[in-house]
């Protein structure tokens, strides 16, 4: 059974929300890749569209968008995701994970690309009575 911590970022508000998903919802993400747009109902955000932007596995190895497949690979990199060189032109062999989501991924990062009619706080149950808009 797959369990994921999904960090959904809201570009309009500049906030991020952490959502734990498991079982059927998590299985719907397996096989998706970085850059894919999925329905927000998987995360409890009905009416929203969410784009997968990255993630990491249990050992902390990051997912690289241009590395095919779900497995880990040691690649020679000069810059980019997961590596910042200390000197100009420096290259290093780093362990990275492919762009496809597999059951051993722990965290999935995503951003909202299409908004629904309800607010995110209301859908996730984070809205308190003071924050709720007054019905007039």
From Swiss-Prot:
A single GO molecular function, which one?
Answer: structural constituent of ribosome
Q: Which domain of life is it from?
A: Archaea
Q: Which GO terms describe its biological process?
A: translation
Q: Which GO terms describe its cellular component?
A: ribonucleoprotein complex; ribosome
Keywords, A to Z?
Answer: Ribonucleoprotein, Ribosomal protein
User: What Pfam families does the record tag this protein with?
Assistant: Ribosomal_S6e
The protein's matches in PROSITE patterns, at most eight in alphabetical order, are given as: RIBOSOMAL_S6E
Q: Give the family, as the similarity comment puts it.
A: Belongs to the eukaryotic ribosomal protein eS6 family.
Q: What is the name of this protein?
A: Small ribosomal subunit protein eS6
Annotated organism of origin: Methanosarcina acetivorans (strain ATCC 35395 / DSM 2834 / JCM 12185 / C2A)
